[in-house]
Structures are given as structure tokens and as C-alpha cells.
Amino acid sequence: MALHEPPSKLNRHSHSNLLKPPSLNKPILTFADNDCLKTPTMNDMLKTPTVNSPRHTPMNIDGTPKVNGFSGFTPQTDQKFFGEHEPLFNQMHTTTLMPAPSSSYKEPAYSSEQPSSSSDEAKPKELLGSNSFGVPRMTNGNSKQKPEELTLKDIEISSTGPGGVDSPGLSAAMFQFSPMVEHFLQNLTNKAGLPELVVDSKTAGLNHQEPSDLIKSVQVRRSSIEDQKFSDVLHVPTLPRKTSEPSHLGSSLQNEHPQSNSRPSTVIPRVQRTNTSASLTRSMDHSSMSPISAHDDPYSNSASYSSLSTHTSFSDSASLAHFEPKTEPMDDYSYNFSDNDFNSFEFSSTSEELKNIGCQKMKSSKMPLQDRPYKCPRDGCDRRFSRSDELTRHIRIHTGQKPFQCRICMRAFSRSDHLTTHVRTHTGEKPFSCDICGRKFARSDERKRHTKVHKTSRSGS
């Protein structure tokens, strides 16, 4: 619109000429036809940019420079409204859908030319009214309109965006915001579908499994490893646990059965029980094949690997319960032994179990009964011990309990020192070394037996 030069001073008649038709030019109190006392109707709101603008009419002071089109509370001679000019209607329509960001900057040229406080109060209310109802403001031509291509682009973007995400039937294009807010909303509208695309492309590109599939695969892999460990334990045959009374134990030679589980509560000593009427000669024949040392073996003390048949007395030489030594220590500790070591190991001494069985009276004579106050509570077992921990280890032989389990191969042991020695077979630790030749061993009894080899070689030479 054309900018009209503000008159230098408005008199009473010229001011009323701008506001009312010529027929109503009379006193100054009737120049607005009492519009300030009327409640604005819908037609008034549609015809005027702001709803509350007629109230400011009597507060204007004569002599205040007024700009045509700025305080348009009444129709001006060069002002157009809805339907009167088609291009203006189209511009209003596009601006209502996506208002121009320059709406917040209004009348920069004449902001300093209005010293009146009433005119200053009219400006924010006009802004409020136009922002609330989306009615186009009549500018004086100084404020720049938003380019048409940008407006069309914004409308197109908002139409392609996910309409109805925040509120069904409403869109951000129906409201007017500041340029910064419009820029932020445009970024959100353009990137609305980006998260799903990023997740889908990442999943497709990296070929990741779902979290549930990963958990299932880990569980399957773990179960397969445990099955493999348990299957390795199955290679060592064991005896089924016997929970019957002692009179039902060991009447004939028991066959070894593989145990399906090697946990401490189910695994029993891997020994064979022979006939209880076996002779002492047969027992000593088996003792010559024993791979366990007599005194220095940590596996063989007064409580280890004793008889499981507790219905007979150890002092009775007529009925002896014999243990066939397990081959497991040979498998665990013999990988660095030579043939000479094996020969000397097999035939140099008898096991502690057989010595306790065959020489019970001699051992009892060595240690008085008062020095062995702990007696085995099992019926038929006359074993006595000087310490309570020895009795505890001895009772595990009757019950078959093995509370110490190897975490590598899941093998169980009845004593902690047995487990410690067994773990060295996995780690390769050899803390014991020969003082003569420097050879290292994992067990102290192995080193002692090796030292005897040096002594015999010196005595023979």
C-alpha cells in the first residue's frame, strides 16, 4: 500500500473527516459514533485488524502525527478488506497458514515519531490481536513480506510432516511464531521420521541380533560349554552312592558306573570295593600297584580314602575291605614323569589306606587312645583321630561328600589340599624343585620320591 505523509497537525474537522462520513461531522464527542461504548461484533472483528482498537480513539491527542494504515480502527480511503481485493485475500490466506517471520518487526520507521503513550499502548495490543486471530495487518509498505516461494515451501513441508502428532486436526502452520521458533519447528518437521530410519539402517547395516536373540545365544553357548565340561568328567568312572546299611555293602565286586553329575553333593570316591572275605595276600598284591606314596602324599593321611564298607573292623585281619587305588592321580600328575620314576613310584611303597588297614594294631600301639579322642561315629568303624578336622575328613569318606570343586573341569574333591594340587595340573605351577638337579615338581611327595632316585644312584656307584 502507498504510504501517506502524516499531516503536520490535525484539527477537529480534519480528524473527524478521517474517521466518519461527511454527514456526521459535528462535535468531537460524537466523531466515533460511540464505537468505544459498543461491544464489538463478529463483523467488527472481521473488518478491523484488532478487536480493542476502537477504545483508543478518544485517547488520541490532536497534533500527534498519525500514519495511514497504522492505527486502522476505522476504514481508510485506501484500505482494502476481505473480498474487496482478490490478491490481498490470497496473501492473507497464505500468511494465515504460515505467517511471515517479519511480523514481530512492525513500523520501524515511525516508532520514534509517536511520543504519545496511548499510541504506544495500541501497538502491543494490535500485535496481540493479530497473533491471536491470524488476521492480516494492514502495513504501510515498509515492513517486508515473506517471499512467496518460502511460504509455499513451508506449507509443503508442513503438509508432508506427520500431521496430528501433537493434536489431531491442528498443525503448526495454523499458528504464528517468531522466526527462531519457526526455524526450530521446521527442523522438527523435517526430522520427524529420522529416528526410525536411523535405527532400521543401523540394524540392517551391522546385522545385529535382537537383544532377546543375543541372550538366547549366550545361554545356549554357556549350556554347551557346561555340557562339555560335564562330559569330560564322565570319562572318570565312579561308584554310585550307597545309602543302605553297612550289612548290605560290599558282598561282591562292584562294577564302576559313570556318574552323570560331578557336583559335590552327588559325586563319591572313585574306588572299587572288593569282596569282604578277600585275603590279606590279595590285598597286598594290589598294594604293589598303588601309585600313591606312603607317608608324604597329601592325599594319604589317616582320614583319606579309607574303607567304605564300615560293617567290619579294621583290626580284624580275616575280613578286610580293600580299595583299588584310583588311576586319576596318575592321569593328573604323571605327564612329566619318566619310566624310572613310574617304576620307583609304583613299587617303592604302599598306600596309606592299605597301611591303615593292614597295620591298624601297630598304629594304635604307636598312639595311645587318650591321644585320639575323636572316634568315628559310624557303626562298625573303629577309627579314632587326634584332631577333629581329621575326623571330619574321615566322615566324608563314609558319606561320599566332596565339597571342593575345580572351577576349570568341574571335578570335585573331598579335601581342599587335593583341590589345590589338582589345580596345578591346569595352571602348570610347579613350586617344588630338586636341590640336586633343579627339576621342578607340582607336589612335595614327587620331589621326595625323586630325591630318593639320587640317593640310590649314589649308593650304587
Curated annotation (Swiss-Prot):
Entry's localization field: Nucleus; Cytoplasm, Perinuclear region
Region listing for Disordered, in residue ranges: 1-25, 96-152, 232-308
Taxonomic lineage from the root: Eukaryota, Metazoa, Ecdysozoa, Nematoda, Chromadorea
Pfam families named in the record: zf-C2H2
Superkingdom of origin organism: Eukaryota
Gene deletion effect: RNAi-mediated knockdown causes abnormalities in oocyte development, including degrading oocytes in the proximal gonadal arm and ectopic developing oocytes in the distal arm. RNAi-mediated knockdown targeted to the soma, on an rrf-1 mutant background, exhibits only a slight increase in the frequency of oocyte defects.
Tissue expression notes: Expressed in sheath cells and distal tip cells of the somatic gonad, as well as in the intestine and sperm (at protein level). Expression not observed in oocytes (at protein level).
Biased composition (Polar residues): 96-105, 129-144, 249-265, 272-291
InterPro entries: Znf_C2H2_sf (IPR036236), Znf_C2H2_type (IPR013087)
Similarity comment: Belongs to the EGR C2H2-type zinc-finger protein family.
Comp. bias (Low complexity): 299-308
Name this protein carries in UniProt: Early growth response factor homolog 1
Function recorded in the entry: Sequence-specific DNA-binding transcription factor. Plays a role in oocyte development, acting cell-autonomously in the somatic gonad. Involved in negative regulation of oocyte MAPK activation and inhibits oocyte maturation and ovulation.
Molecular function GO terms recorded: DNA-binding transcription factor activity, RNA polymerase II-specific; RNA polymerase II cis-regulatory region sequence-specific DNA binding; zinc ion binding
Residue spans, zinc finger C2H2-type: 374-398, 404-426, 432-454
SMART domains documented for this protein: ZnF_C2H2 (SM00355)
GO cellular component: nucleus; perinuclear region of cytoplasm
Gene Ontology BP, a term: negative regulation of ovulation
Gene3D superfamilies in the cross-refs: Classic Zinc Finger
Record's keyword terms, sorted: Cytoplasm, DNA-binding, Metal-binding, Nucleus, Repeat, Transcription, Transcription regulation, Zinc, Zinc-finger
